[in-house]
Amino acid sequence: MIKIEQANVEDTPAIVAFQLAMALETEELRLDPPMVQQGVNAVFNDPGKGFYLVARDGNKLISSLMITYEWSDWRAKTVWWIQSLYVLPEYRQQGVFRQMFDWLSHQARESGTVGGIRLYVDNRNLNARAVYEALGMDGEHYRFYELMF
C-alpha cells in the first residue's frame, strides 16, 4: 500500500538521488551532487522555503516532490508550486502522482490559506503534460519565462 506523507530529513539521500535522476532523464542535465545536497538540506533547514512530499511503498521511498510558496496579492493567499517531481520508473503509470496530488489538494483546500496549486513542466515532456491535464490542471493560461544565473 502506498503511503503519502511529508518527508523528513532522513529522506534526504533518496530525494537527492531522485533529483539527479530526474534532471538527467527529463532535461539531459547532469547536476552537481553536492549542490543538490545543499539545496535539499536548505529546504529542511528553512521551512519558509517549502517542504517535500514523499510516497512510500512499505519502507521504500518511491517518489518525491517539493512544494515552494508564492504569495498571490490577487487572492491574498499562498500558491503552492509543485517542483522536482520524481517517481521511480517501476512505479510510473500506477497512480502514485495522482495520490500525491490528491493529498496536496486536500491539504491545500483544508488550510484556508492556499489559493491554488501550480507547476511548470518542460515543453518536451509530453507524458508529464498529459498526466497534469488528466488531473484537471490548465496549462493554457500562462507562459513561463526565466532568466537563470
Predicted segment positions?
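A conserved beta-turn-beta hairpin within the catalytic core of GNAT-like acetyltransferases
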Residues: W71-I82, R92, T113-G115, E140
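Active-site acidic-Proline motif in GNAT/NAT acetyltransferases
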Residues: L88-E90, Q94, N123-R124
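Conserved acetyl-CoA pyrophosphate-binding loop and the N-cap/start of the following alpha-helix
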Residues: Y91, G95-W103
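Acetyl-CoA-dependent GNAT
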Residues: Q6-V9, A17-K77, Q83, F101, ...
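Hydrophobic adenine-recognition pocket in adenosine-nucleotide-binding enzymes
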Residues: A7, L85-V87, V121
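Conserved active-site alpha-helix within GNAT-family acetyltransferase domains
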Residues: R98, N123-H141
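Terminal substrate-recognition subdomain of acyl/acetyltransferases
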Residues: E110, A134, R143-F149
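Conserved GNAT acetyl-CoA-binding A-motif
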Residues: R109-Y120
